[in-house]
Each structure stands twice: as C-alpha cells, then as structure tokens.
Amino acid sequence: GAVFFVLLPRTAHAALRHLIPDRFHISGFSNEVLLGQIGQLRLSSTPVMHTRIYNSAAGVDLKWRGTTLAQFDGRRWFNEIDRGEPVLVNRHQARLAALEQLGRPGRRVHYEVQLKSATDDVLFFLGVPEVINIDAPQIIRTAASGYRTGGLAFSSRYEAISFVDDPLSPPLTPPMMSEAARRVHLQTPLMNPGVARLAREVTAGKLTSEAKARAIESHLRTQYGYTTELLREPVRDPVGHFLLVRRQGHCEYFASSMAIMLRTLGIPSRVATGFQSGSYN
C-alpha cells in the first residue's frame, strides 16, 4: 500500500541550537524533529533559499520538501543512518523519476533554487521531482525519499522540473511496501490510548485511507489552535498531551499527531520536513 506524507512547513533547528538561551528555540530546517520542548519558539526570518518559477505556478501550493522522517520514539522523529544511493549527473542533468512518472499526464513546474543558508546538504523540491540540472558529478538519493549532495562541493544553485498535484491526472499505482518498511511506518510508541480512540471517532464512516487522512486533517485544522508558546513543563507523551489536553501547538505537533493517528488506524505514514511558501518579489 501507499505511505502517506505529512508535511512540516518548518522544523526545529539543529545547527543554531547552541547560539541562543535554552528557553528559546529557533525555527528552521533539521533532519530530526523534537517534541515536548519547553520555553518559546521564535520564528526565524533568515532567508534559506531564493527560488524562481519559470512557468506559471498559479494555484500551486508551494511546499519545498527536504526529507522525510519515519522513526518516532514518542518525542523525536528521526531516521536511521542511511548512506543512500548515488544518482549520476550527466552533462549537468539527472533523471530522478521512473519512466512511468515521466509519462504521467499532468502539470509540471520548472523552477530554480539558490540555497542561501546552511541546510546540511539537503536539496529541496516541489511536488514529485522528475529532472534536475545541477553542477555536480552526482547526488545522493536517500531511503527517506530525499536527495542530498553527499557533502560534495557544488554551486548551491540548481534547476528542476517537478510534477505537482493535479486532481485531473490519473493516480499512479503505488509500489508495494516491504513488510519491514510497513512495520517502520506503522510503529507507534507507548502513549495515551485516547489518541487511537480519537482517530477512530474522527474517521468513523470513512472507507478509504485517503478519506480517513482528509478527515483527520480537517479535524486538526478546525478543532486545534496554533501557538509558538511551548510547554511550561515537560510531559511524557507530547502527542497525547497536544491532542487530548492542550489542544494547541506549532507545526510539529499538528504533523506528528496526524501521522500517529493514521498509524493507529493501520495506515503507513511519515512526516516530511521542509519549508512552505515564502515572500514574493
């Protein structure tokens, strides 16, 4: 079956953690997400990248995905160490998608990315990346459906063509998950049983995985509030506390809760980290 991606518009930082007092946490990009922090979240206005769209992107929800996280221990989303597989770049170009995807009818966006600040060596893409133009001998495809430079020096600028969501385009048949991958994407830590009960209540009467996912998304959007105020004291079960007690939080709580609620229903899921939208000029 398919695995659902739940996007985090921005994630807790790692590289800047030592630059500020412990009671403050700066938003940014990281290869892990930590829940249950106390203090206050400060949104960073430091530009992370400049982008240029070469064709019309009207109506496109600009979500720049960096990587995905599948392991969750109750407080932290992370991935096991993954060396990935090389994708050779021939004459500055590499194909990232299978032929079936390349032949799929639907909308494409052609864009340029200029990375501006440290984001490890992660490459960011819209939608489903199909082709990249980059001044590097190779890039690395990770098991988490992401791409990185592998530590190689490159110009920090690249162009790409991506397939973007199009309701008129026929869906692809999702590849079958291995039993090992399915176990990872269904794993849930010990938590308040009310989380699974809430997931069943919210999705009652919904027959498909997609319908259940949309029901959970709608519930979180309409019944919970957004705040940058973090917890005043630590809790043992951050997801359960968010869903059943506090009912407000920042992006990490919404995405984590949706992914875990899906998993309690037997629907494989993981969170995708990156950035959403931006300033236009």
Question: What do the PLM-derived regions correspond to, one by one?
Answer:
Residues G1-N281:
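Helix-boundary/low-complexity linker signature
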